[in-house]
Structure formats: C-alpha cells, structure tokens
C-alpha cells in the first residue's frame, strides 16, 4: 500500500517536472492555438441565403409564349413548373441582371495579410450595384471596367499611387496610370481597356477581373437554386446564397422581376406572381 502511494507521488512529481521544464513550449502552443482561433473567427465570411416564392399560372407558360417551336424544343407542357425553372436559369433572364448589377466584375483585396485579418474585425464586403462595384467605407469604387476578350477572366492589379492617381497592371505585366474620378482608356494590341475609378484610398491594392458572359452566368447559377415547392403546386422556390446580405436580396429580386418582365413582354401578364421575397437566412460562418 505504501509502495503504491510512493509510486503515485513519484508520477505526480515527474509530471510537474515535465511541465516546468517545457513551460515555454506549452505556452507557445497555447498562444498559437489562440491566435489560430482568432484568425479564423476574424477572417471567416458568413454566408447568407435569401428566398423568393413565385406562383406559376398553369394556364400559361413563359416558354409557350415564346413560340411553339421553343416549347417543342424543350419538350415542355404548358404551365410546367420545370419549364419555368429552366427559363429562370436561362441566359435570357440572368445575363441582363448580371449586366445591370456589374456581376461580371470581380474585385478582391490584394495581399490581405495574416496581421490584417487578425486585427481587422471583419473584411468589408464589396457590393455590386447599378452604379458600379466597390465599398465606400474603404474608399473604393469602380464605375466601369471593360477589357478585350483576350484579357477576360484574368486578373489585373489596381493600386493607388496617391489619392488622385492609380496604376493598373495587366495580366501580361503592362503598366498603365490614370486619374481617380476620370474615365481612362488604355490601348493594347488586343484592344482598348476602359476603366473609371471614382474612389481609391491610398495604401490598398486590388485584383480586378472582367468575366466573360458565360463565366459570369456560371458563377451566378452556382449560388442560385430554383425548384418547385412541393409536387405539382405551381409554386417555385427561388433562393440565392452569398456573403453580402443586401446584394443577394437585391440580385434575386432583379431575377424575379426580369422573369416577370419577359412574361409580360410576351403577353403573359398573369403568368407569375411574387408571393414572398426579401427573406434571408444566416447559413454558416
């Protein structure tokens, strides 16, 4: 019995000795874990989801209104909810919305360091609107950015030289300089690059890319889901996910409106009715 107590005491003393001898390593690991947790919490972007319900009148169909040949091509019956799902996901509906809201322009902050993510509470989101892309809270706004086909889907680097001037570096390394709040045109062998930067705070650099219509539509479809709610209900549930709450709500509203407009233009004013919209859910961190 005494021998067992002594063994326990020896084990306890050995454990304390190990802790004392390696306290620096243990403390370092604890601090590293703490910093890693803070980094993830600060840099992780929350994802939101917005929904809109659309009632489809079974007496008419957006596809049938476009002509019998199109309806036959899609092998769809009048009033088919699945047919309307395909219409909403079509280029005819999505591309005008992308064009209106500049969703074919990607803007991402360059060299977002570990220290920046650790110290800044949350990254400020870039918004896509009818007037351009950016976020005035960080002094960034791009009203226009158009590039030749050879440069589409490729990254440019935009850097503020000072509060009045900027530098744009093309994917092949060519450098151009322009003035903030002034439309600029840069000539290249592939064609003209048009850009208008209305606001750009010094000290920041950004990756810019102008997407092809096909790529922009593909990106939007990845976040857009449309399906019939229930079976043969004639009600479609459209949802859009993204990091910017206001933007996804505005974008989905535009998609629904564009769908309704197409039906109105084809003398199908009673085809759709928006039942509910601007509802969103916080999905993940």
What is each stretch, according to the model?
Residues 1-283:
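Hydrophobic and amphipathic membrane-targeting/association helices
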